[in-house]
């Protein structure tokens, strides 16, 4: 014991104290690092949101996100890719919200739909095409290749160029469902993803026919794109008809989520469904939930 006390006056005590300090530091540092990382992760989640999915909703959501960021400082990253991507990303935790331009299916009951607006799907042709209306049977004949010339419908003696939506797009799903078609029966000349691709294809080809969001089609036509929206089942393709429940290919515009919403997600949802934002929906020719 005397030896220990004597040695501590020299170097032994310092060695022991130094070792104890190093051991304590070794234990504390990982805990501190983990705590800092956890805090950093929490800060990132509350200061940013990711929203992916429907190309129909994406332009509207981008503008709403910009307004929200200006107001709150919370960054909102909006990415399109189709409603299918919105569903998948939300389930995998890659997105806080998925944009889905249809009602959820029974097998998607693990997700929660937050209705933000309404829209419809319109058949479109070039404004220079003399054909002004087609019934459902004629549209089916065109899309299955049974009729391949506009002359069969009082139009020009020219081949019909069929523009069809890609898999994973809710616009395609609803189109097929309405006309009682399976995708393998459709004989397209062009397959597109984004609505803007469909607008560009039909606006640039007098012999093309396609289908896109009513809101997007009206927006682009008003901006000068040479488009004509055809009546569907005899009902004009207008927002008024959608609003009154008369248009046969109307649809929900949803943000979907999984599990409990974070505070940031809840606050964003409240912001975009506030009646004060209704004007932005009207700018994009959509019907907002709150008016």
Indicate where each model-derived feature is located.
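General secretory precursor processing signal
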Residues: 8-11, 45
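Hydrophobic helical h-region of N-terminal Sec-dependent signal peptides
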Residues: 32-36
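Bacterial N-terminal signal peptides that target proteins for export
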Residues: 9, 19-31
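Exported/periplasmic ABC-transporter solute-binding proteins
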Residues: 42-84, 88-94, 100-291
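Intrinsically disordered, low-complexity segments enriched in serine/threonine/proline/glycine
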Residues: 15-16
């Amino acid at each position: 014991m005397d030896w220990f006390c004597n040695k501590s006056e020299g170097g032994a005590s310092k060695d022991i104290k130094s070792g104890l300090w190093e051991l304590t530091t070794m234990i504390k540092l990982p805990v501190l690092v983990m705590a800092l990382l956890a805090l950093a992760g929490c800060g990132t989640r509350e200061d940013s949101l990711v929203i992916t999915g429907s190309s129909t909703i994406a332009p509207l959501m981008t503008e709403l996100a910009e307004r929200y960021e200006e107001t709150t400082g919370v960054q909102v990253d909006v990415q399109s890719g189709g409603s299918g991507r919105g569903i998948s990303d939300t389930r995998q935790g890659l997105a806080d919200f998925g944009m889905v331009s249809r009602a959820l299916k029974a097998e998607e009951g693990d997700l929660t739909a937050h209705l933000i607006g309404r829209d419809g799907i319109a058949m479109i042709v070039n404004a220079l095409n003399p054909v002004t209306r087609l019934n459902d049977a004629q549209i089916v004949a065109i899309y299955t290749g049974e009729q391949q010339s506009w002359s069969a419908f009082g139009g020009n003696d020219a081949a019909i160029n069929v523009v069809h939506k890609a898999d994973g797009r809710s616009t395609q799903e609803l189109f097929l469902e309405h006309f009682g078609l399976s995708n393998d029966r459709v004989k397209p000349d062009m397959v597109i993803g984004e609505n803007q691709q469909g607008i560009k294809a039909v606006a640039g080809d007098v012999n093309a026919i396609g289908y896109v969001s009513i809101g997007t089609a009206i927006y682009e036509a008003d901006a000068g794109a040479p488009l004509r929206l055809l009546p569907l089942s005899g009902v004009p393709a207008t927002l008024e008809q959608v609003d009154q429940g008369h248009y046969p290919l109307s649809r929900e515009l949803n943000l979907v989520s999984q599990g409990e919403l974070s505070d940031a997600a809840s606050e964003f949802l409240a912001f975009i469904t506030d009646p004060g934002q209704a004007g932005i929906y009207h700018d994009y020719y959509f019907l907002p939930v709150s008016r």
